[in-house]
């Protein structure tokens, strides 16, 4: 049984949710998101509240689908109302970044700078040369882009150098000891 799937979603003021067959569209002050949802889970709108009810046999697949669709819609509503942010820090001597147009240029210890194309639905800011702020209304796109940038030079366990999330803790390991 999906505990998340049965939770009620409250629609805040300024946000509208419309359903056209299998496509749910959410509009808010920050933008608009649309996603295709499975018809196996019924969406019931009562005033400013939304509930999801499974239709048909409630097996493991339906349980997962029920909770996932509810979480996806809640994330869409939060995204168009407040947006999502991720902050990355560059840790290491000489590691720096800059933004040129829609390209993020990273100098992270390789022989050449690494260019990363910023998707259109994501806003990237570089307040200083060791910080990257990623913002957008789609939680999955923001997280995927942040993971893609972090993957270029993920933190290593001996000195902690690399690209890390702002509040990420890296457990440092001890190096080899001589005889």
Curated annotation (Swiss-Prot):
The gene is rplF. Coiled coil: none annotated. It comes from the Bacteria. The keyword NADP does not apply. HAMAP family: Ribosomal_uL6_B. This protein binds to the 23S rRNA, and is important in its secondary structure. It is located near the subunit interface in the base of the L7/L12 stalk, and near the tRNA binding site of the peptidyltransferase center. This is Large ribosomal subunit protein uL6. GO terms for biological process: cytoplasmic translation.
């Amino acid at each position: 049984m999906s505990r998340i799937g049965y939770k009620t979603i409250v629609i805040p003021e300024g946000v509208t949710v419309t359903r056209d067959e299998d496509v749910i569209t959410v509009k808010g002050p920050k933008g608009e998101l649309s996603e295709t949802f499975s018809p196996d889970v019924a969406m019931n709108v009562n005033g400013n509240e939304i509930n999801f009810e499974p239709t048909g046999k409630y097996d493991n697949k339906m349980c997962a689908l029920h909770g996932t669709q509810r979480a996806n819609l809640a994330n869409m509503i939060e995204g168009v109302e407040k947006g999502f942010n991720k902050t990355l820090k560059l840790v290491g001597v000489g590691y720096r970044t800059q933004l040129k147009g829609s390209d993020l240029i990273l100098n992270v210890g390789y022989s050449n700078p690494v260019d990363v194309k910023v998707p259109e639905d994501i806003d990237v800011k570089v307040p200083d040369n060791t910080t990257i702020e990623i913002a957008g209304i789609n939680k999955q796109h923001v997280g995927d882009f942040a993971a893609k940038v972090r993957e270029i030079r993920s933190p290593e366990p001996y000195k902690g150098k690399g690209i890390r999330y702002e509040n990420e803790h890296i457990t440092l390991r001890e190096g080899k000891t001589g005889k």
